[in-house]
Swiss-Prot record:
Alphabetized PROSITE patterns for the sequence: WD_REPEATS_1, WD_REPEATS_2, WD_REPEATS_REGION
Organism from which the protein derives: Saccharomyces cerevisiae (strain RM11-1a) (Baker's yeast)
GO cellular component, one term: microtubule
Notes on the domains: Dimerization mediated by the LisH domain may be required to activate dynein.
Keywords: Cell cycle, Cell division, Coiled coil, Cytoplasm, Cytoskeleton, Microtubule, Mitosis, Repeat, Transport, WD repeat
Keyword field contains Transport: yes
Annotated localization: Cytoplasm, Cytoskeleton; Cytoplasm, Cytoskeleton, Spindle pole
Protein name per its UniProtKB record: Nuclear distribution protein PAC1
GO biological processes: cell division; establishment of mitotic spindle orientation; microtubule sliding
Major subcellular location class: cytoplasm
Subunit and interaction comment: Self-associates. Interacts with NDL1 and dynein.
Record-stated family: Belongs to the WD repeat LIS1/nudF family.
Length: 494
């Protein structure tokens, strides 16, 4: 055996089969191309292939078989083995892809096992301190693991997601105007689905009413806003697992961008903002429009409500604070370079002095009930602002502070590579999602990014939701849900 034969990682039989496959492919190729495109070279090419077979094929029987198959009298016959080589080549490529997929799945499973082992260790050391079996401190310290607990698929891109305040149910709104309710313990089929709008749903909010008047029964309200210029209000009937429409709110003249529902005493109100540059306040019980004001010169994209105050973010790159009962604009924040996608108040939480921005710095801010807010923008940044105190007068609506009416940016979070779409605050953590297909967790105390989820979605991540930490009517749970352009919702649970 020669030196080059020793270097070839094939047995004699394997080498012979490979040579035959190569010759058969060359034979098929010259029949298909040379005879039609280079007819003048037909005989010379055919002779060269026959000569080559004499060198490569070891057995005389194999050579004779190939020569007879290559004879011109048999040119109408198609050897079924002539395409064996390209078929094998294609099979190898498919096998390589399959191997890569299996390796990725193995890595995912190994990571999931590590996360589960970590959770088991934490649970073994965990000591419950509250009646529901979880300490408030540990609940607020929770950061979701790398992989979701369940994956929900719908028919079109997910535009908004909301968790039921008390039950293991997630509400999903889509770009086709459909509204879904999924049981997180049996999510293969939705509990309910409804074509709630004729165009895309842009925003959704939920509220479990807490009427002190015994004549009114408490229930969950789901509010949706849409590109069809309408706002729909639904009652979630838990006993029948269905949406029951209460009313529609009409009045905006362009796309309704965001909607918010809240309760103060026995009064329930709904706030909405639109591309028509207005913000409207609605009475939940009768559907009347109580107030309309125009805080911005361009499209109002997002709002949040805290008591009698509304913060709004706009296409004009500013965010503004308004006293909604009077319509008085109180202060403005400038600093973003591109349109603002999301705004939120940062609520105070009790007994957490170690958490930055969650405790008032002065008694005046404590009495006012707010001090900080956060905004997310298309400029890829998230900014935390200190809101200036307005001039407060007894029995009168607040007015702007003549010496200080501008928000002060106290922290800028940078890390996303594209538009930041949504934000949610829980304890000392701020969660954000963006068009860079990632979800990030930030530490409010340090401003550092603690964790990044990069492979949750294959497209833009449009929305996310976590249980709020400032409402006693919401069950403290360790859950997070995300929704994306890839028609999927990822749910994380401990």
């Amino acid at each position: 055996m020669t030196n080059w034969q020793q270097q070839l990682p094939l047995t004699d039989t394997q080498k012979n089969e490979l040579d035959k496959s190569v010759l058969r492919y060359l034979n098929w190729n010259y029949k298909q191309t040379v005879r039609h495109e280079h007819a003048q070279d037909y005989e010379s090419v055919r002779h060269a292939i026959v000569t080559l077979s004499g060198f490569l094929l070891q057995e005389s029987v194999d050579r004779q078989e190939f020569i007879s198959n290559n004879d011109t009298s048999n040119e109408s016959m198609v050897d079924i083995d002539e395409l064996l080589l390209p078929k094998k080549w294609n099979s190898i490529v498919r096998l390589q892809k399959k191997i890569i997929e299996l390796e990725q799945n193995t890595e995912t499973l190994v990571s999931q096992i590590k996360d589960l082992n970590t959770q088991v260790s934490e649970l073994a050391q965990f000591k419950p301190t509250t009646s529901n079996g979880a300490s408030a401190h540990n609940v607020l310290k929770w950061i979701p693991r790398n992989l979701p607990s369940c994956l929900i698929n719908v028919e079109s891109s997910v535009t908004s997601v909301k968790l039921h305040p008390n039950l293991p149910i997630v509400f999903v709104a889509t770009d086709h105007g459909k509204l879904y309710a999924f049981d997180l313990f049996n999510y293969t089929i939705p509990l309910a689905s409804l074509q709630s709008h004729t165009k895309a749903i842009t925003s959704m909010d939920v509220l479990f009413t807490n009427f002190t008047n015994s004549s009114k029964k408490n229930y969950l309200v789901v509010v949706t806003a849409s590109k069809d210029l309408q706002i729909h209000v639904f009652k979630w009937v838990s006993e029948e697992c269905k949406f029951q429409q209460i009313r529609s709110l009409l009045g905006h003249e362009h796309i309704v961008s965001a909607v918010k529902i809240w309760q103060k005493n026995n009064d329930v109100h709904i706030a909405s903002c639109s591309r028509d540059q207005t913000v409207k306040i609605w009475d939940f019980h009768n559907g009347w429009s109580l107030k309309t004001f125009q805080p911005h010169s361009q499209w109002v994209r997002s709002i949040d409500v805290l008591g009698d105050y509304i913060i709004s973010g706009s296409h004009d790159t500013t965010l503004r604070l308004t006293h909604w009962p009077s319509g008085n604009g109180l202060s403005v924040g400038t600093g973003h370079e591109f349109p603002i996608e999301k705004v939120k108040f940062i609520h105070f939480i009790e007994d957490s002095p170690e958490i930055r921005f969650r405790t008032p710095s002065t008694d005046r801010y404590k009495n006012w009930g707010m001090q900080y807010c956060v905004s997310a923008s298309r400029d890829r940044t998230i900014k935390i602002w200190e809101i200036p105190l307005p001039t407060l007068m007894a029995h009168r609506a607040p007015i702007p502070n003549p010496t200080d009416s501008n928000f002060r940016c106290v922290l800028t979070l940078k890390g996303h590579l594209s538009w930041v779409r949504d934000i949610s605050i829980r304890g000392q953590y701020l969660f954000s999602c963006a068009d860079d297909k990632s979800v990030r967790c930030w530490d409010l105390n340090t401003g550092q990014c603690l964790h990044v989820w990069e492979k949750l979605h294959t497209g833009f991540v449009n929305c996310l939701d976590l249980d709020v930490d400032f409402d006693s009517n919401v069950t403290p749970r360790q859950m997070m849900v995300t929704g994306g352009l890839d028609c999927k919702s990822n749910v994380f649970m401990r």
